[in-house]
């Protein structure tokens, strides 16, 4: 299992220790676990709620529906314009073999409910509470990547938080 220690400690145990970041002193890798198992443990230790893995194979089945959406004017304007880049992950990173998809849960209940009044009140969506989710997720991706770099050689990555070329929902579905 992965353990992150805030204070430097030394133990006699079946772990490898690596410096990880200023916030945490050590990244602890359990001998005998697969790289995937170590990555999952790391993800959970830095606050990633869900993590999935999939191949960097093409999403060719999306091509027809993506082109139709453009023709019918059903795009929101936030989608990446190049459909080829949306369905071929290796156009974003030619060395890609695996795509890691993460999810972080939002707080969904107020710690203290507002008092009922005669006046109507609006509600804000939970994903607008606190920091912009783009920054939160990018930070988690960067921390995950730093940990993976400590575990493996020749690691190359490109992080995307719904601003990249790939279709996020398709990646997440295939990654489980």
State where each predicted segment sits.
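Auxiliary alpha/beta "docking" domains used to position bulky ligands
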Residues: 31-176
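Positively charged N-terminal leader segments that act as targeting/secretion signals
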Residues: 6-26
């Amino acid at each position: 299992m992965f353990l992150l220690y805030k204070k430097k400690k030394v133990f006699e145990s079946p772990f490898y220790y690596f410096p990880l970041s200023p916030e945490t002193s050590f990244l602890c890798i359990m001998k005998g676990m697969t790289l995937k198992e170590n990555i999952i443990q790391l993800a959970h230790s830095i606050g990633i709620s869900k993590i999935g893995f999939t191949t960097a194979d093409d999403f060719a089945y999306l091509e027809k529906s993506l082109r139709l959406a453009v023709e019918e004017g059903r795009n929101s304007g936030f989608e990446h314009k190049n459909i080829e880049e949306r369905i071929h992950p290796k156009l974003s990173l030619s060395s890609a073999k695996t795509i890691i998809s993460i999810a972080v849960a939002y707080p969904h209940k107020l710690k203290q409910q507002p008092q009922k009044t005669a006046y109507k009140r609006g509600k804000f969506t939970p994903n607008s509470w606190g920091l912009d989710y783009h920054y939160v997720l990018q930070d988690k991706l960067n921390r995950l990547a730093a940990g993976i770099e400590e575990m493996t050689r020749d690691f190359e990555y490109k992080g995307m938080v719904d601003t990249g070329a790939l279709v996020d929902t398709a990646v997440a579905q295939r990654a489980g």
